[in-house]
Curated annotation (Swiss-Prot), chain A:
Entry keyword annotation includes ATP-binding: no
InterPro entries (UniProt xref): AP5Z1 (IPR028222), AP5Z1_ARM (IPR055450), ARM-like (IPR011989), TPR_AP5Z1_C (IPR056856), TPR_AP5Z1_N (IPR056857)
Name recorded for this polypeptide: AP-5 complex subunit zeta-1
The entry's keywords: Cytoplasm, DNA damage, DNA repair, Hereditary spastic paraplegia, Neurodegeneration, Nucleus, Protein transport, Transport
Keyword hit for Nucleus: yes
Swiss-Prot record, chain B:
Basic and acidic residues bias: start-end ranges: 250-260
Domain of life: Eukaryota
Keyword Membrane annotated: no
Keywords: Protein transport, Transport
Annotated Gene Ontology cellular component terms: AP-5 adaptor complex; AP-type membrane coat adaptor complex; late endosome; lysosomal membrane
InterPro entries: AP5B1, AP5B1_barrel, AP5B1_C, AP5B1_middle, AP5B1_N
Region of interest: Disordered: 234-260
Role, per record: As part of AP-5, a probable fifth adaptor protein complex it may be involved in endosomal transport.
Subunit structure: Probably part of the adaptor protein complex 5 (AP-5), a tetramer composed of AP5B1, AP5M1, AP5S1 and AP5Z1. Interacts with ZFYVE26 and SPG11.
Matches recorded under Pfam families: AP5B1_barrel, AP5B1_C, AP5B1_middle, AP5B1_N
Annotated GO biological process: endosomal transport; protein transport; vesicle-mediated transport
The name this protein goes by in its record: AP-5 complex subunit beta-1
Length: 807, 878
C-alpha cells in the first residue's frame, strides 16, 4: 500500500524513543515560544505530526508543548498551513485534559473551524459539541454578508449533527433546512472569479464562463456536485457541502427526529391522497421547510442520476460520478423511508439505473445501495427484486472478489440487512461459496464480519458442505490467486505476491484433468455434493507460502469456532454424527499451509468433544468409524490433540450409562484397538523423521484403557499388565529420549495410580465412570445430594480413631 | 574350520573389542574361545598375532570363558601349549603363563580339584625359584623375565586365594636372599606373609616353621590347600587403603595369640630383610610393601613398629605421593608408637605448604587437601567416624587453605570442607583478631549464590553452589547460626532464578531434615507469595510439588487457583496436578476439593481435565487411609477399621437425632393478602450452614387444620434466604400460637433437632379481602353485606382512638386492602373476610380529633371481642 520510502519513514517514526521525542518537543517549544513561524517550525511540526499519527495513542506530549500548540493555533498572524498542522496534532492527541481552547475568541471562520475540529475530537466531555453547535449556528444565523465563513463552518455543523442529534432546537433546525434548500437549489451557474492576484495581477483575466457538465456541455439546469468549472464561487462550495451533509441531516430531522410535527401537518394537509399525481404536482406549492428540503433533495438526486449518465471527460470525474450515484441512491432510500410518496417517483428511474449499471463492472459499487433500496422498499413497491439479488450474489463475487472495498461493503451489506432478507434467506444461504470467495481473498478484514454473519448462513442442509468449504478456504485462496494470474491482463491488477512464482501450479490450473475439481472449488452456489480435494492440496503445495494463503489459514480456526457454535443450534442427531465423521475424516486432509493443521486440529478436537457432549451416544453409533480412525496410526502424532480428544471421549462415553446399546463386545473391541495403538505409539523408536508422540497421548490412552477395563472386568488383568509395562518403560532410558523428564514422570505417576485403582475394582468402577452430577458445583457441598458427605460420615463411623464429630 | 589368517583375526578381534558382549551374543561368539585356543598352536600365525590373541584372553577372560569348567579347559589348553613350545626363546611363554593364571583366577577354577591348578602352581613356583625344570624348558636368556612373571602370577593367585603360598614362605624367603628379581619376590613374600599371619592367627596357630622351612612343597606331593580352606577367601582387600573394614576383627584375632620368641625373631628377621631391600623397589611397589607389612604387623605383640623407624628417616623427606600416602597409612596404623609429635607437626606443615603450592597439578593439589582433611592423628579424639580438622592445624596454618571463588570447583569444595570443620570447632575458641571462619564461610556462600543467580550463567556454577550448600549442611547440621542464613540465601537464590528448581528438589532430597524442613517452609513461602502469570510457572509448580504439605493451605491453594488460569498446555497442567497430588497425600481436604472441581471443569486439555476429575472424585469419596492407598503404593495400607462392633459414644451420636440449641431463627414477615387462604410469610435465618432443614408446625388448640412441614434444602448465614410461605387453614377465625420444631443436618453430618420459639398468629393475619366489586358498585355491595349480617350476627360500636397519623393514615396503614368504599378523608367502608366463612364489616365515619367511632357488624359472635380489641389497638400499633 505504501511505497518503500514511506514505509521506512513510518518505521522511523514508530521507533523513536521517548527521550528523543522529548528533546524534539523541547526544540519545537523553543521555536513556538519565539513565535518563529518560518519554514523551520513548519518542518518540525510536520515531523511531529508524522510521529504522533504513526504511533497511535502511545505517545503523550508534555503540557507546555500542548499549550504552545494551542496558543499558536489562536495566533491571528499565524499562517494557515501552521494552523492546520497544529489542529491536526491536537486532534491526534485528543482526548486531552489540558485543553483550554476558547471557542469565543476566535474571529476568523477558518480558524473557528479548526478549533471546532479539535474540540469535537474531545469526545464531548464538557458538552463541547453542544457549545460548538450553538456557536456555529449563531454564525449561520447572523447572516453575515458573505460566505467564506459559512463555507468553513458547514462541515463542522454536519459533524455536530451526527455527534449530538439533539443539539438544535426546532426553529434552528427549520432555519438550517431553509438555508440548505437555498444552497442546494440556487447556487449560481457562473464560474467563480480567480483570486485577485494583488497589485501586479493582470486585469485581462478571463471573464468567468458558465459552469459545465462533466462532458463539457454548458449546464442546463441548477448547479450540482457534478457540475464542473475552473473555479467555484462560495455558494457553489456550499452547494457541494450541503449535499455532503444532506443524508445525515435528513436522517436527523426525519419523521422520527424532531421534525415529526411537520409530517403530521402535511399529511393532514394532503389527507391520504398519496396518489402519484398529487405527489408529482406538489413541487411547485409552498411547503413547510422540511418538506421543501425533501423535495429539493429529491430533485437534486434525480439530476445527479441524470448527470451521471453523461460521459465524463476526465477519469476523476467518472469516479466522482460513481461516488455521487451511491450517495444519491442512499439519499433516495432515506427519502422514501421518510415519505413513501417519493417511492413511486423514484422507482422507475432507479430501475433504469439498475439496468444501466448492472452491465458495467466499473460501477459495481452502486449495485449495493440499489439492492438495499429494493430490499427495503421492494415489498411496498410490489417490485420483484429477485433478479437484483440473483445478479448480486452470483455474478459480483465471482468477478470482483479481489476488490477489497467492494468485499467489505458487500459483506457489511449482507450483515446489516439480514433482517430484511427474511424471504430471500435461502438465496443468501445457497450462495455461501460465493461469499467465501470474498473471505478467502480478504480474510483479515472480513473475519469478524463473517463471525457475525455465519449464524445466519448456517443451515442444516448445507452445514456439511460449508464445513468442507471452511476447511478448504486456504486452498480456495490459492486457487483464486491462480485464477487471477492466469486471467488475461486486467486493466487494474489486484495486489498479489509477485515474489512467489509457481509455474507448475499455473499449469495444473489449466490442466483439463483437474478442471472438475477447480470448478467445484470455484462454484458460485452450494451444490450439495462434496468432493475430495486431496489431489489439489498436493498440487497447490507451492502456493502455501503465499502471504494471502497464510493469512487465510490463520483466520480459519476462528471461523470454525463460529461455525460450530452456530451449527450446534440447528443440528439434529444425524447431522451431529455426520459432522463428527467429517471432523475425523478431514483431520488428515488439510491444505498444507504452515501452521494450518495445528490450529485447525485444536479447534476440531474441542469441537469433537462438544459434539460428544451434545450427543454422547455418538461414540456407540460411530464405533466402527472411530475404530477405523484409531487404526490409521500414521500421522497420528501430528494429530495428537484430536487423537487425545477421541480417545478420551471413548473412555468417557462408551458406557451403558450413556447408551444402553453399548455392549461388552464393543468395549472389548475398543480395548484391543487402543491397546494396539498404545503399543504402537510407545514402541516406535525415536527418529528424526517422525514427530515425537506427545506424552498426553500415552496418558490418555492408559486412562481410557483403565476405564474400559473397569467396565468389563475380564480385562483388568490385561490392563494391569499393560500399565506395569508402561511404568517400567517410562523408567527405561530409551523413553527418556522420546519424552522429556516431566513427561516420563507423568506417565509413570499415571500408570502407578491407575494400577492401584485397578486393584480395587469396586472403587475403580465408581471413580472411573462417575455420574454426570459430579461436576455440578454443589456436588460435595450439599448435604441433600452429596454422596461424598454421606460416605465421609459412614467412614467416620467405621473408623474408631477418627474421633467422631463433636456432639 | 581351519586356522584363520592374520587379517581375519584382526578383523574379528576388532569386532569383538568394539562391543564384547554384543559380539559374544552374536553367531560367532561361541567359537571365539575355541578358535583362539586352537590357533595358538597353529604354525601359520606369527608370534605377534598370537601375543595379541593372548592379550585378548587376558583382558576379557570373563567373556571368553564364562564358567569354571570352560576356564579349566582353557587353562589346561594354555598350559599344554606352553609345554609344547620348542626350546628356543619365544615371546609367548610369559603371556601364556599370565593367560593361564588369568583364566583360572577369573573363571573361579582355582582349587584343589582343578587339574590345571595343580599343574600350574608347581610350575610357577619352580620358575620363580629359578630351578631348571628339565628338558630345556627355559632358555637361559629368558630365565630372569620368566622368574619375575612367575612371581607376578603367584602373587595374583595368592591374592585370589589367600594362604595359597603359606607353605612356601621359607622357600620364598630363601629366594629373596639369592640373586633374582627383587621387586616381584619382595611383593610376593610380603603378601604371602601378611596372608599367612592373618589366617594363622585367626585359627589360633603360630607360624611354626613356615618361615624357615625351605623345602619346596612340590617336592612332597600334592599342594597344601589347608590354609586356603581356612581362609575361606574372606581376606580380600584389593587395594592399599586404610584397612578400616577389617580392623575390628583383624585386631582381635591378631592379638589373640602370642608368638613364641623363636617365631617372633624369625618374623622380625624376615620383615627387616624385606625392608632393607625395599629401597630397590619402585615407589609404588615400596608403598605396597609398606602397606602390606604395616598391616601384617599392626597389633602383633612383640613386634615393635620400631622396625619401620629406619625407613621413616628416608620417607619423611620423600616427594613421592605414593610413599607419602604409605607413610600416612603407617601413621594411621601405629600412631604414637612410631611417630612423635614433632613428626606429626612436620608432616602437617609439609602437607599444608604443599597443598598451597601454586604449580601443582589439580589432582596432586586435591590429594594433599584430602590428606589434610583425613589426617591420621597420633591420639584420635572423639568418636570414630566424626570429622574434625587435625588438632595441630592452627589458624595460622589454615589461613593459606581458605577457599576462594577463584579456585577450581573441586579444590574449592575440598577447602570448603576444611573451612566447615574449622567452623564446627570455632564455638569453643574465643574470638581472635582474624575474621571468624564462620563469617568467611557466609561470605563465600553468598558469593557462590550470587554467581549461581547470574542469568544465563553456566550450569556448572549453580551445581557448585548446591554442592557447597550440601557440604555445609552436612558438616554443620547442628548449627542454626550457619543454617539460618544458608536457608535464607537459598530462598533468595530461588527467587532470583527459579529455573534452578530441579537443583533445589535434588538438594531437598539429599539433606537431612534439619535443613530440609525449614528450607521447605521458606521455599514454599517464596513460591506462594508470587502468584500469577510468570515465565517461571513451570518451575514454581515443580518446586511446589516438592515443598507443599499440609501447612499454609490457603496460601498454596490461592496460588494454585491463580496459576490454573495460566496453565494452558498439558505439561503445565500436569505440573499443577502434581502439586494437587502432593497436597492430597499431605491430607489436605477443604479448599482442595473446590480447587480440583474447578480444575475438572475448566482445564483446556481433556486429559488434564480427566485427571483432575479423577483426583476430585477420589478426594470427595474416599476416606484418608484409602485415599493414601489409591494415590500410591508407598503409603502403608491401613489396618482395617473394625470399630463397627465397638461400643462407641460417637457412633451412637451419629446415628441418633440429637437435641441441639436452635441454629435457626424465624421471623414473621409482612402480611400477605392474596389468594384464598391467609398465608404467613416466614423469614428464616441460620447461624451456621445447615442442610435439609425441615420445619414442623403445631397449632395449639385445634384452631387450624394441621400444617404442612416446610422443607429448605440449605441455609447459610450471611446469604439471604427466600421467604417461606406457610398457608393457614383456620377452623375458626381466631389468633393462635404455633409451636415450631426444626430438624436439620449440620455440615458435619449430624442430624439435629431443635425447639424454636413459638410463633404467634395475630387476628389481623387472618384477614382476607372480599373480591373487588365492579367500579361504582362498591357501596351497593357493601350495603348488601352489611344487611346480610344481622339476623344471626351481631352489631356493635367501638371507639377507635386515632394516633397522630389521623384517620387516613390509619386506614392506609392497616385496612387498605379491605376498603370497599372510600370517601377520604371522612368515611370508609371496610369489609373483611375471615376464613373459613365469617365476615367483619366496619364503617368508619366522621373522625373527631382523637378518635373515630366505628360501627361494626359481623356474622360471627365470637369475632366481636377480637375485633373490638383489634380496633382499639390499632392506634398503638405502628
Amino acid at each position: 500500500m505504501f511505497s518503500a520510502g514511506a514505509e521506512s519513514l513510518l518505521h522511523q517514526a514508530r521507533e523513536i524513543q521517548d527521550e528523543e521525542l522529548k528533546k524534539f518537543c523541547s526544540r519545537i517549544c523553543k521555536l513556538l515560544q519565539a513565535e518563529d513561524l518560518g519554514p523551520d517550525t513548519l518542518d518540525s511540526l510536520q515531523r511531529l505530526f508524522l510521529i504522533i499519527s504513526a504511533t497511535k495513542y502511545s505517545r503523550r506530549l508534555e503540557k507546555t508543548c500542548v499549550d504552545l500548540l494551542q496558543a499558536t493555533l489562536g495566533l491571528p498572524a499565524c499562517p494557515e498551513q501552521l494552523q492546520v498542522l497544529c489542529a491536526a496534532i491536537l486532534r491526534e492527541m485528543s482526548p486531552s485534559d489540558s485543553l483550554s481552547l476558547a471557542w469565543d475568541h476566535t474571529q476568523n471562520s477558518r480558524q473557528l473551524s479548526l478549533v471546532a475540529s479539535v474540540l469535537l475530537a474531545q469526545g464531548d466531555r464538557n458538552e463541547e459539541v453542544r457549545a460548538v453547535g450553538q456557536g456555529v449556528l449563531r454564525a449561520l444565523e447572523s447572516r453575515q454578508p458573505e460566505g467564506p465563513s459559512l463555507r468553513h463552518l458547514l462541515p463542522v455543523m454536519a459533524k455536530v449533527v451526527v455527534l449530538s442529534p439533539g443539539t438544535l432546537q426546532e426553529d434552528q433546525a427549520t432555519l438550517l433546512s431553509k438555508r440548505l434548500v437555498d444552497w442546494l437549489r440556487y447556487a449560481s451557474l457562473q464560474q467563480g472569479l480567480p483570486h485577485s492576484g494583488g497589485f501586479f495581477s493582470t486585469p485581462r483575466a478571463r471573464q468567468p464562463g458558465p459552469v459545465t457538465e462533466v462532458d463539457g456541455a454548458v449546464a442546463t439546469d441548477f448547479f450540482t456536485v457534478l457540475s464542473s468549472g475552473h473555479r467555484f464561487t462560495d455558494d457553489q462550495w456550499l452547494n457541494v457541502q450541503a449535499f455532503s451533509m444532506l443524508r445525515a441531516w435528513l436522517l436527523h430531522s426525519g419523521p422520527e427526529g424532531p421534525g415529526t410535527l411537520d409530517t403530521d401537518d402535511r399529511s393532514e394537509q394532503e389527507g391520504s391522497t398519496l396518489s402519484v399525481i398529487s405527489a408529482t404536482s406538489s413541487a411547485g406549492r409552498l411547503l413547510p421547510p422540511r418538506e421543501r428540503l425533501r423535495e429539493v433533495a429529491f430533485e437534486y438526486c434525480q439530476r445527479l442520476i441524470e448527470q451521471s449518465n453523461r460521459r465524463a471527460l476526465r477519469k476523476g470525474d467518472s469516479d466522482l460520478q460513481k461516488a455521487c450515484l451511491v450517495e444519491a441512491v442512499l439519499v433516495l432510500d432515506v427519502l422514501c423511508r421518510q415519505d413513501p410518496s417519493f417511492l413511486y417517483r423514484s422507482l422507475s428511474c432507479l430501475k433504469a439505473l439498475h439496468g444501466r449499471v448492472r452491465g458495467d463492472p466499473a460501477s459495481v459499487r452502486v449495485l449495493l445501495p440499489l439492492a438495499h433500496f429494493f430490499l427495503s422498499h421492494g415489498e411496498a413497491a410490489a417490485v420483484d427484486s429477485e433478479a437484483v439479488y440473483q445478479h448480486l450474489f452470483t455474478r459480483i463475487p465471482v468477478e470482483q472478489f479481489h476488490s477489497p472495498m467492494l468485499a467489505f461493503e458487500f459483506i457489511q451489506f449482507c450483515r446489516d440487512n439480514l433482517h430484511l432478507f427474511s424471504g430471500h434467506l435461502s438465496t443468501l444461504r445457497l450462495s455461501f461459496p460465493n461469499l467465501f470467495k470474498f473471505l478467502a481473498w480478504n480474510s483479515p478484514p472480513l473475519t469478524s464480519e463473517f463471525v457475525a454473519l455465519l449464524p445466519a448462513l448456517v443451515d442444516a442442509g448445507t452445514a456439511l458442505e460449508m464445513l468442507h468449504a471452511l476447511l478448504d478456504l486456504p486452498c480456495l485462496t490459492a486457487v483464486l490467486d491462480l485464477q487471477l494470474r492466469s486471467a488475461p491482463a486486467a486493466s487494474e491488477r489486484p495486489l498479489w505476491d509477485t515474489s512467489l512464482r509457481a509455474p507448475s501450479c499455473l499449469e495444473a490450473f489449466r490442466d483439463p484433468q483437474f478442471q472438475g475439481l477447480f470448478q467445484y472449488l470455484l462454484r458460485p452456489k452450494a451444490s450439495g455434493a462434496t468432493e475430495r480435494l486431496a489431489p489439489l492440496h498436493q498440487l497447490l503445495q507451492p502456493m502455501a507460502g503465499c502471504a494471502r494463503v497464510a493469512q487465510c489459514a490463520q483466520a480459519v480456526p476462528t471461523l470454525l469456532q463460529a461455525f460450530f457454535s452456530a451449527v450446534t443450534q440447528v443440528a439434529d442427531g444425524s447431522l451431529i454424527n455426520q459432522l463428527a465423521l467429517l471432523l475425523l475424516g478431514r483431520s488428515d486432509s488439510l491444505y498444507p499451509a504452515p501452521g494450518y493443521a495445528a490450529g485447525v486440529h485444536s479447534v476440531l478436537s474441542s469441537q469433537f468433544l462438544a459434539l460428544c457432549t451434545l450427543k454422547p451416544s455418538l461414540v456407540v453409533e460411530l464405533a466402527r468409524d472411530l475404530l477405523e480412525f484409531l487404526g490409521s496410526v500414521n500421522g497420528l502424532c501430528s494429530r495428537a490433540s484430536l487423537v487425545t480428544s477421541v480417545v478420551w471421549a471413548i473412555g468417557e462415553y462408551l458406557s451403558v450409562t450413556y447408551d444402553r446399546r453399548c455392549t461388552v463386545e464393543q468395549i472389548n473391541k475398543f480395548f484391543e484397538a487402543l491397546e494396539a495403538l498404545l503399543f504402537e505409539v510407545t514402541q516406535c523408536r525415536p527418529s528424526a523423521a517422525l514427530p515425537r508422540c506427545p506424552p498426553q497421548v500415552v496418558t490418555v490412552l492408559m486412562t481410557t484403557l483403565t476405564k474400559l477395563a473397569s467396565r468389563s472386568q475380564d480385562l483388568i488383568p490385561r490392563a494391569s499388565l499393560l500399565l506395569s509395562k508402561m511404568r517400567t518403560l517410562a523408567h527405561s532410558p530409551a523413553t527418556s529420549s522420546t519424552h522429556s523428564e516431566e513427561g516420563a514422570e507423568a506417565i509413570r505417576t499415571r500408570a502407578t495410580e491407575l494400577l492401584t485403582l485397578l486393584k480395587m475394582p469396586s472403587v475403580a468402577q465408581f471413580v472411573l465412570t462417575p455420574s454426570t452430577e459430579v461436576c455440578s458445583p454443589r456436588y460435595h457441598r450439599d448435604a441433600n445430594t452429596a454422596l461424598p458427605l454421606a460416605l465421609r460420615t459412614v467412614s467416620r463411623l467405621v473408623e474408631r480413631e477418627a474421633g467422631l464429630m463433636p456432639g | 574350520m581351519g586356522p584363520l589368517s592374520r587379517d581375519a583375526w584382526a578383523q574379528r578381534l576388532g569386532a569383538f573389542r568394539a562391543s564384547p558382549s554384543a559380539f559374544m551374543a552374536g553367531p560367532e561368539g561361541e567359537d571365539l574361545g575355541r578358535d583362539l585356543l586352537s590357533d595358538l598352536r597353529s604354525e601359520k600365525l606369527s608370534e605377534q598375532t598370537k601375543v595379541s590373541l593372548l592379550a585378548l584372553s587376558m583382558e576379557y577372560p570373563a567373556q571368553l570363558w564364562p564358567d569354571a569348567s570352560a576356564a579349566e579347559v582353557a587353562a589346561t589348553s594354555l598350559l599344554d601349549t606352553l609345554v609344547l613350545l620348542p626350546p628356543r626363546p619365544s615371546a609367548l611363554r610369559r603371556p601364556l603363563l599370565l593367560a593361564a593364571t588369568t583364566a583360572l583366577a577369573a573363571g573361579g577354577a582355582l582349587g584343589p580339584t582343578s587339574g590345571a591348578s595343580c599343574r600350574l602352581l608347581p610350575l610357577l613356583l619352580g620358575l620363580a625359584a629359578g630351578s631348571d625344570l628339565g628338558r630345556g624348558f627355559v632358555p637361559a636368556s629368558e630365565q630372569r623375565p620368566l622368574q619375575a612373571t612367575a612371581c607376578e602370577c603367584l602373587r595374583e593367585l595368592e591374592s585370589c586365594k589367600p594362604g595359597l603360598l603359606g607353605g612356601s614362605l621359607g622357600l620364598l624367603r630363601g629366594l629373596l636372599g639369592q640373586e633374582g628379581p627383587v621387586q616381584p619376590l619382595s611383593l610376593l613374600l610380603a603378601l604371602a606373609l601378611r596372608n599367612t599371619l592373618v589366617l594363622q592367627s585367626r585359627v589360633g596357630a603360630g607360624l611354626g616353621g613356615l618361615l624357615t622351612d625351605k623345602v619346596s612343597p612340590t617336592g612332597g606331593g600334592p599342594w597344601d590347600w589347608t590354609l586356603v580352606e581356612e581362609g575361606d577367601g574372606r581376606l580380600q582387600p584389593q587395594a592399599p587403603s586404610w584397612p578400616a573394614a577389617e580392623e575390628g576383627e583383624g585386631e582381635r584375632s591378631l592379638t589373640a595369640r602370642e608368638h613364641s620368641p623363636e617365631e617372633a625373631r624369625e618374623l622380625r628377621a624376615a620383615v627387616i630383610q624385606l625392608l632393607d631391600t625395599s629401597y630397590l623397589l619402585t615407589p609404588v611397589a615400596q608403598a605396597q610393601l609398606l602397606w602390606l607389612l604395616g598391616w601384617a604387623l599392626r597389633g602383633l605383640q612383640g613386634q615393635p613398629p620400631a622396625l619401620f623407624k629406619p625407613q621413616l628417616v628416608r620417607l619423611l623427606g620423600t616427594a613421592q605421593l605414593t610413599l607419602l600416602h604409605a607413610m600416612l597409612a603407617l601413621k594411621a596404623a601405629f600412631g604414637e608408637a612410631l611417630f612423635t609429635a614433632q613428626d606429626e607437626a612436620l608432616l602437617l606443615r609439609r602437607l599444608t605448604l604443599a597443598a598451597q603450592h601454586p604449580a601443582l597439578p589439580p589432582p596432586t593439589h586435591l590429594f594433599y587437601l584430602h590428606c589434610v582433611l583425613s589426617f591420621p592423628e597420633n591420639w584420635p579424639l572423639g568418636p570414630e567416624g566424626e570429622e574434625a580438622a587435625p588438632l595441630l592445624l592452627g589458624p595460622q596454618l589454615c589461613r593459606g587453605l581458605l577457599p576462594s571463588l577463584l579456585h577450581d570447583p573441586m579444590a574449592l569444595l575440598a577447602r570448603l570442607h576444611l573451612l566447615c570443620l574449622l567452623c564446627a570447632e570455632e564455638e569453643e575458641e574465643e574470638k581472635g583478631q582474624l575474621p571468624s571462619p564462620r563469617h568467611y564461610l557466609e561470605e563465600l556462600l553468598a558469593g557462590l549464590r550470587q554467581r549461581a543467580a547470574l542469568d544465563g550463567g553456566p550450569r556448572a556454577l549453580a551445581t557448585l553452589c548446591f554442592q557447597a550448600s550440601y557440604l555445609v549442611a552436612c558438616c554443620l547440621a547442628g548449627q542454626p547460626t550457619v543454617l539460618t542464613p544458608l536457608i535464607h540465601g537459598l530462598a533468595q537464590l530461588y527467587q532470583a532464578r527459579p529455573m534452578l528448581a530441579p537443583h533445589f528438589v535434588d538438594l531437598l532430597d539429599q539433606v537431612d531434615s534439619e535443613l530440609r524442613e525449614p528450607l521447605k517452609v521458606v521455599l514454599r513461602q517464596v513460591v506462594v507469595s508470587r502468584p500469577g502469570r510468570d515465565e517461571a510457572l513451570c518451575w514454581h509448580l515443580q518446586m511446589l510439588a516438592k515443598v507443599a504439605d499440609g501447612d499454609a493451605q490457603s496460601a498454596t491453594l490461592n496460588f494454585l487457583q491463580a496459576a490454573a488460569a495460566h496453565c494452558t498446555n498439558w505439561d503445565l497442567q500436569q505440573g499443577l496436578l502434581r502439586v494437587c497430588r502432593a497436597l492430597l497425600r499431605a491430607g489436605v481436604r477443604g479448599g482442595l476439593v473446590d480447587l480440583l472441581q474447578v480444575l475438572a471443569r475448566q482445564l483446556e486439555d481433556p486429559d488434564g481435565r480427566d485427571h483432575a476429575r479423577l483426583y476430585y472424585i477420589l478426594l470427595a469419596h474416599l476416606a484418608a487411609p484409602k485415599l493414601g492407598v489409591a494415590l500410591g503404593p508407598s503409603l502403608a495400607a491401613p489396618a482395617l477399621a473394625s470399630s463397627l462392633v465397638a461400643e462407641n459414644q460417637g457412633f451412637v451420636a451419629a446415628l441418633m437425632v440429637q437435641e441441639a440449641p436452635a441454629l435457626v431463627r424465624l421471623s414473621l414477615g409482612s402480611h400477605r393478602v392474596k389468594g384464598p387462604l391467609p398465608v404467613l410469610k416466614l423469614q428464616p435465618e441460620a447461624l451456621e450452614p445447615i442442610y435439609s432443614l425441615e420445619l414442623r408446625f403445631r397449632v395449639e388448640g385445634q384452631l387450624y387444620a394441621p400444617l404442612e412441614a416446610v422443607h429448605v434444602p440449605c441455609l447459610c448465614p450471611g446469604r439471604p434466604a427466600r421467604p417461606l410461605l406457610l398457608p393457614l387453614q383456620p377452623r375458626c377465625p381466631a389468633p393462635a400460637r404455633l409451636d415450631v420444631h426444626a430438624l436439620y443436618t449440620t455440615s458435619t453430618g449430624l442430624t439435629c433437632h431443635a425447639h424454636l420459639p413459638p410463633l404467634f398468629v395475630n387476628f389481623a393475619d387472618l384477614f382476607l379481602p372480599f373480591p373487588q366489586p365492579p367500579e361504582g358498585a362498591g357501596l351497593g355491595f357493601f350495603e348488601e353485606l352489611w344487611d346480610s349480617c344481622l339476623p344471626e350476627g351481631a352489631e356493635s360500636r367501638v371507639w377507635c382512638p386515632l394516633g397522630p397519623q389521623g384517620l387516613e393514615g390509619l386506614v392506609s396503614r392497616h385496612l387498605e386492602p379491605f376498603v370497599v368504599v372510600a370517601q377520604p378523608p371522612t368515611s370508609y367502608c371496610v369489609a373483611i373476610h375471615l376464613p373459613p366463612d365469617s365476615k367483619l364489616l366496619l364503617r368508619l365515619e366522621a373522625a373527631l380529633a382523637d378518635g373515630v367511632p366505628v360501627a361494626l357488624r359481623t356474622d360471627d359472635w365470637a369475632v366481636l371481642p377480637l375485633a373490638g380489641d383489634y380496633l382499639r389497638g390499632l392506634a398503638a400499633a405502628v
